[in-house]
Structure formats: structure tokens, C-alpha cells
Amino acid sequence: MKPSSSNSRSKGHAKARRKTREELDQEARDRKRQKKRRGHAPGSRAAGGNTTSGSKGQNAPKDPRIGSKTPIPLGVIEKVTKQHKPKSEKPMLSPQAELELLETDERLDALLERLEAGETLSAEEQSWVDAKLDRIDELMQKLGLSYDDDEEEEEDEKQEDMMRLLRGN
């Protein structure tokens, strides 16, 4: 084993070394300098407190007092109102073409077949069917057509046939 290089005195309680006058004066000056720095930094009330100088603008909470940077007009400017452009309207079909589209509508045909079969339609489907049938009636009136034309022609033919029979022709 090697003998320890430390002194046997170091193992016990070490005596406190007295500081020289110069060291005491230097420590006093350091304490005074630290005491002067106590308190808040100048302008801390307006600056918002603890802000680190190294991370300005990064991950710092945004000050609510700083507003928008958009320019504000200082003079009186007349407000220009934008006129609404109407949405592209459906191209107007002739009444004849619209009537043909409604008569060949597969959904309308399917719903009418369900009604004839005795099924009940939901309120939405029923209102849709009613609206389409009303539109068909309007178009037929515009065009001078009616459902009764076919029936009237048949009745007229029957009456003519009866008249021929009565006359003996």
C-alpha cells in the first residue's frame, strides 16, 4: 500500500483562515454592487416583467396592448357597396321541354307507382311529388293541354258512334 500523500492535519477540523483587510474590502465592494442591483429593472412595468433578452419574439407571450399593423384611412372615404352577383340560374327551358323532363322523371314515376300500389310516402317525398304534379299542371295549362282532352275525345267518339247507330248509317 502506498502511503497517503495528504497530511494528517487535513483529516481533522481545519482552522478558519483569517482574511486580510484587502479581501474584506473587496467582498464589501461586491456586496454593495449587488445591493445596488436589487429590485426591478428600469422600465419593467411597461415592458411586462420577465422577458429574456435572447428570445425576443420567440415563444414569448404576445402583449395584448400591441394592436394590428393594418393601416387605417384618416380621411373620409365613401364606402363602396359590392353588388351581389346572382348565382348562375338554371337555364330556362321551354315549357314543352320542361314538361317532357317532368313526364320522363324516373323518381316521380317510381313514387307515383308506389302511391298507386297503396304505399304511404314520407312527408318529404309526398311534398316533392305534390310540387312536381303542380308544376306539370301549370305547364299543361300554359301549353293549352289537359288530362281531360283524351277522355273528352273518347266520349266524343262514343257519342258520334251512337249518333251513327241511331241514324242507321
Swiss-Prot record:
Keywords: GTPase activation, Ribosome biogenesis. Residues 20-30, 160-169 have a biased composition (Basic and acidic residues). Residues 147-159 have a biased composition (Acidic residues). Residues 10-19, 31-40 have a biased composition (Basic residues). GO terms for molecular function: GTPase activator activity. It holds the Pfam family YihI. It comes from the Bacteria. GO terms for biological process: ribosome biogenesis. Interacts with Der. HAMAP family: GAP_YihI. A GTPase-activating protein (GAP) that modifies Der/EngA GTPase function. May play a role in ribosome biogenesis. NCBIfam families: PRK05244.1-1 (NF003560). Belongs to the YihI family. This is Der GTPase-activating protein YihI. It comes from Escherichia coli (strain 55989 / EAEC). The gene is yihI.
